[in-house]
C-alpha cells in the first residue's frame, strides 16, 4: 500500500442470510435458496467507498464458514480484505421475507463469537502493520464478546501514533472509552452519544473528539472547530430510510469519509453524506435473485437527493 488506502475495521462482521418465503401449506412454509451478503457497518462503508472509486481495504475479525462467506462476498464485489481469522463463527443475521408484496419480514440475529486475548493480540499486530499504508482508518460498529470496552480507544491511539486520521462510528461504552483518545471524527446516533457520553456532539468535542456528526430524526448535526451545521432533507420524505437506521448508518459514515480526507467544507460533507444515507444502501435492500447487483450506489437517486439536502447553522433561540 502507498498511504492512500482507506482501511475499514469491522470487529463484529456479520453474514446476512436472506430467504424468500412462499405460501404455507400443511403447516410448512417453503423458502428459497439463501442469498448471502457480507455485513457490518465497516463492511458497508468499504463497499460503498469502493463503489465511488476509492482505494479501500476491509479489515477486522472473521471466523468459521460464515467468515469465509463474508470474505468471498467482498472479493466478488472487488473489495480487498485483510481480516484476522478467529476460531469462533462470525455472527449471522437472517431475514425471511413475506410472500405478499409489502408484507412484514422476520429478522433474527445471532450473538456472534467470543474473542480470545490471543486473537485480539494477533488482530492488533495486523492492524498496526496496515496503518503503514493507510490514508485513514474507519472503526465501525459493536464489539464482539471478549473484547474490552476500551478496544477502540487503543486502536485510535495506535493510528494517532502512526499519523493516520481516525473516523469512529460507535456508541455506548465503546464510545465513552474511545472518545478521550481524540478521534478525528465521531459519528453516532443521538441516543448512542447520550448513552456513551451523557450529551450531544458538543459533549463529544469536550471529551476529546476533534469533530462529531450526530444523526437523529432524519437529520445530521455536526459540531466542529469551524462551527456547527444541521443537514436535513426537504421535503422530509424525499427518501425512505432515516439515516439513523442500521441500514443507512454505514452509508452515512461512508459519505463523510471523502470530505474528511480531502478537506471539503462541512456543508459539502454533510450534503454528500446525507444524500448517500437517504438512499438506504444496505444488505437488506435487495432480496435474493433481484437484479441490481452493483454492490453500491444508486447514482441517480444520490444525485437527485443532493438537491434535496439543506444545510444550515442551527437556529439560535
Please give the residue ranges for each predicted region.
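Glycine-rich phosphate/adenosyl-contacting loop at the front of the ribokinase-like
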Residues: 1-59, 238-242, 309-317
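Charged C-terminal helix
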Residues: 2, 268-317
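Gly/Ala-rich phosphate-binding loop of Rossmann-like dinucleotide-binding domains
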Residues: 50, 205, 261
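Conserved N-terminal subdomain of the carbohydrate kinase-like
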Residues: 51-135, 296-317
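Phosphate-handling active-site elements
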Residues: 55-58, 226-229, 234, 259-274
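Conserved beta-alpha-beta core of the PfkB/ribokinase-like small-molecule kinase fold
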Residues: 136-199
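Conserved phosphate-donor
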Residues: 184-185, 200-239
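Short, small-residue alpha-helix embedded
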Residues: 194-195, 240-270
Amino acid at each position: 500500500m502507498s498511504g492512500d488506502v482507506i482501511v475499514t475495521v469491522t470487529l463484529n462482521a456479520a453474514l446476512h442470510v436472506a430467504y424468500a418465503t412462499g405460501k404455507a401449506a400443511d403447516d410448512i412454509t417453503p423458502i428459497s435458496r439463501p442469498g448471502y451478503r457480507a455485513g457490518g457497518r465497516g463492511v458497508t462503508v468499504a463497499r460503498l467507498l469502493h463503489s465511488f472509486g476509492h482505494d479501500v481495504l476491509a479489515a477486522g475479525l472473521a471466523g468459521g464458514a460464515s467468515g469465509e462467506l463474508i470474505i468471498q462476498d467482498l472479493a466478488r464485489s472487488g473489495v480487498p480484505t485483510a481480516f484476522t481469522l478467529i476460531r469462533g463463527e462470525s455472527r449471522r443475521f437472517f431475514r425471511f421475507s413475506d410472500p405478499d408484496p409489502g408484507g412484514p419480514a422476520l429478522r433474527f440475529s445471532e450473538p456472534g463469537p467470543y474473542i480470545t486475548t490471543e486473537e485480539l493480540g494477533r488482530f492488533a499486530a495486523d492492524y498496526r502493520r496496515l496503518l503503514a499504508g493507510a490514508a485513514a482508518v474507519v472503526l465501525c460498529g459493536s464489539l464482539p464478546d471478549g473484547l474490552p470496552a476500551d478496544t477502540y480507544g487503543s486502536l485510535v491511539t495506535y493510528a494517532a501514533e502512526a499519523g493516520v486520521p481516525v473516523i469512529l462510528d460507535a456508541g455506548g461504552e465503546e464510545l465513552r472509552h474511545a472518545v478521550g483518545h481524540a478521534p478525528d471524527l465521531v459519528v453516532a446516533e443521538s441516543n448512542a452519544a447520550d448513552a456513551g457520553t451523557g450529551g450531544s456532539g458538543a459533549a463529544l468535542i469536550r471529551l476529546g473528539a476533534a469533530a462529531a456528526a450526530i444523526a437523529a430524526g432524519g437529520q445530521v448535526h455536526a459540531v466542529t472547530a469551524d462551527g456547527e451545521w444541521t443537514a436535513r432533507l426537504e421535503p422530509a420524505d424525499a427518501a425512505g430510510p432515516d439515516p439513523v437506521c442500521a441500514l443507512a448508518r454505514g452509508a452515512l459514515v461512508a459519505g463523510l469519509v471523502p470530505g474528511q480526507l480531502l478537506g471539503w467544507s462541512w456543508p459539502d460533507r454533510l450534503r454528500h453524506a446525507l444524500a448517500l444515507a437517504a438512499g438506504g444502501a444496505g444488505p437488506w435492500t435487495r432480496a435474493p435473485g433481484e437484479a441490481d447487483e452493483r454492490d453500491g450506489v444508486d447514482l441517480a437517486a444520490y444525485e437527485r437527493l443532493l438537491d434535496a439536502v439543506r444545510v444550515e447553522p442551527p437556529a439560535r433561540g
